[in-house]
Amino acid sequence: MKVAVLGAAGGIGQALALLLKTQLPSGSELSLYDIAPVTPGVAVDLSHIPTAVKIKGFAGEDATPALEGADVVLISAGVARKPGMDRSDLFNVNAGIVKNLVQQIATTCPKACIGIITNPVNTTVAIAAEVLKKAGVYDKNKLFGVTTLDIIRSNTFVAELKGKQPDEIEVPVIGGHSGVTILPLLSQIPGVSFTEQEVADLTKRIQNAGTEVVEAKAGGGSATLSMGQAAARFGLSLVRALQGEKGVVECAYVEGDGQYARFFSQPLLLGKNGVEERKSIGKLSAFEQNALEGMLDTLKKDIQLGEAFVNK
């Protein structure tokens, strides 16, 4: 199994690469790519960790050598948020980066599963889909927006509030991956109940958690370490499913039946070909139903922005 990380010299990429080097199954290959000249050195640094995961690093304009034979490609390349920016302010720079990298994937490893981490995910996934479509290699079961950070944050915040162990909590999060489009389904956590005020406050905290980190880092970056952990969790789940493990479920932002929007984050059963089944979002509370209806215009606009970027 070969996993490629694009944007591997950045804050998220390095954290992600470290976790994959220590946790991928024995015999896996890990390929690191970034435009930054330091990237082969990051690979050498990680190569000293004693795990049976082969690692190589590649730098420069051409990602092709890193992508050859990849089964999974995780894209974290792009610029990070600064205070006062929201994820959509990143669009102008990151849209071009994602478009270019996905074009290289389309020619080099068109059958790979692709996980997009680069923000704004609501939009960059639509860009990736349109690029793959133009190249005639789009498979909607193999393109994912990685929203796992919203899930791990939800798990952490709920556990803190309710005095539970965080590994006992699994909160499904649906919708998209910014602001109001992030909708944690707090009504679906077994054995945990909330007051209306707790639901409103927790939902807002989960939606604004990225900004909490950006402000706390005081201009020194955005969420890199928790995002690295979230991306590793998603990537490792995908690898396990591709290798035939049954019953692997993760939420991610994918193209579905269009019931809510063309792309929508929901629980997915993963399998040997990527998405095996898009699972129902289940029964929503009145608060959740209202939040879902209220976000769809924003989500659809984010998606259209990405489609238009490729098709202009």
UniProtKB/Swiss-Prot annotation:
It comes from the Bacteria. Substrate binds at residues 81, 87, 119, 153. InterPro entries: L-lactate/malate_DH, Lactate/malate_DH_C, Lactate/malate_DH_N, Lactate_DH/Glyco_Ohase_4_C, Malate_DH_AS, Malate_DH_type1, Malate_DH_type1_bac, NAD(P)-bd_dom_sf. GO terms for biological process: malate metabolic process; tricarboxylic acid cycle. Belongs to the LDH/MDH superfamily. MDH type 1 family. Catalyzes the reversible oxidation of malate to oxaloacetate. Homodimer. This is Malate dehydrogenase. The gene is mdh.
